Amino acid sequence: MVSMNYLPKDSTSDWIVREINGLQTPEKASVSVYARGKDYHRVMRKRLSKLAKRICLEVGSYGFRACVDSAPLLEVELAQKSGLGWRGKNTLLLKRNEGSFFFLGTLLTDMPLKTTQNTTMNLCGTCTSCLDKCPTKAFIAPYVLDAKKCIF
């Protein structure tokens, strides 16, 4: 499992505040940050393929398949088990100091790998910031999303 940050390089806390405040204006349309750039599926698949080729150069030829929302995989659960982060109360994977502003990609392989100890963690505690800031109030409860409320 890998992640790729999608915040603009020039993003600051002021930029994030402006974006969030823009969501509070119902008469103003807003396009999600992740949809403003190149198609992340293509970008990540290309990067994962390069990574697979690099691995083959280092350790020998093995089979690989790059997946970015293109296979019936539970990506958040796999990422959590791999130690990338934890599932937040907003149902997304969260990373310490990065939040949820990243894409997930999977590199499947037939290469034998050592298993490691599960590093599942949850650092949300009593925090409900992501639920409180949801502009459409789409969360019925922690970890429970009413997807019908996601679109204005």
What do the predicted segments below correspond to?
Residues S129-F152:
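Iron-sulfur cluster-binding cysteine motifs and their immediate structural context
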